[in-house]
Amino acid sequence: MDDDNVLFHIRTLQGNVIKSLFDCLKEILHDVMLSFGPTGIRISALDGAKVSLVHLKLDSESFEEYKCEHTYELGVNVLNMFKLLRSAGSHDSILFRYLKNDPHMIELTIQNFEKNSLTKFNMKLIEIDSVEIEVGDIEFDTIIVMPANYFQRICRDMSDITDHLVIVKKGDEVSFNSDYTCVTDFASQKTIIGDSDNGQITCNNDTDYESKFSLKYLTSFCKASGMSSAVEIYLKESYPLILKYTVGSMGALKFVIAPILS
């Protein structure tokens, strides 16, 4: 095909990571604007209820092939994208192409070089009104780095008891608590972490912290643990909570959610 007809050509060998990414995103986003540009792929979108913000940046240098001279904003349905990616295996590459003579489609190719197999899809694009929202640079009071699957287990176990997770920081100790203000909960839970293999806590000041968050959203965010060994948790009083996951070795995925005001 004439190279002049190819507006971008992007291939990664981390097909399983891309599949895991959209498996996670489909729990939070419905329709989303994918921004393909010279420096990488971006998403900046609010969920349908406008409760949480999703911010994704995949760096162009992390792809095996990346040819995209201009920026293209393409609207896709996240669930439909995952349905196409679902067949990708751990040894499959994924190729995204956008063609000048077919501007209402994005071309997606899943290829296994060992098996000499190839599956090609053409997915319809959709019209979306989207405004990009940046995550500003803020100096957070406390940063927690812990195994992503451990934080996922805390949230999953806590959701069997309560609807909300209360994060408390006092001194150099951080605890994850069930909502002790809810009289309908049949039990309470408190998990305390300090500096260890299960968590590293960086305190930029001595400010104590306590905020409450929706476990419905946190458990959805935790699906990102399938592609990230660790999660970074950013805390600052009267500010939204930020969870940061790596996307394989390709970039970072951030979730931003405001605290629940009592």
Curated annotation (Swiss-Prot):
Signal peptide positions (record): none
Record-annotated DNA-binding residue ranges: 67-86
HAMAP family: DNApol_clamp_arch (MF_00317)
Identification of the protein by name: Probable DNA polymerase sliding clamp 1
GO molecular function, one term: DNA polymerase processivity factor activity
Cited NCBIfam families: pcna
Keywords: DNA replication, DNA-binding
InterPro entries: DNA_clamp_sf (IPR046938), Pr_cel_nuc_antig (IPR000730), Pr_cel_nuc_antig_C (IPR022649), Pr_cel_nuc_antig_CS (IPR022659), Pr_cel_nuc_antig_N (IPR022648)
Function: Sliding clamp subunit. Responsible for tethering the catalytic subunit of DNA polymerase to DNA during high-speed replication.
Organism (species): Paramecium bursaria Chlorella virus 1
Domain of life: Viruses
Similarity remark: Belongs to the PCNA family.
Pfam families linked to this entry: PCNA_C, PCNA_N
Biological process terms in GO annotation: leading strand elongation; mismatch repair; regulation of DNA replication; translesion synthesis
Transmembrane segments: none
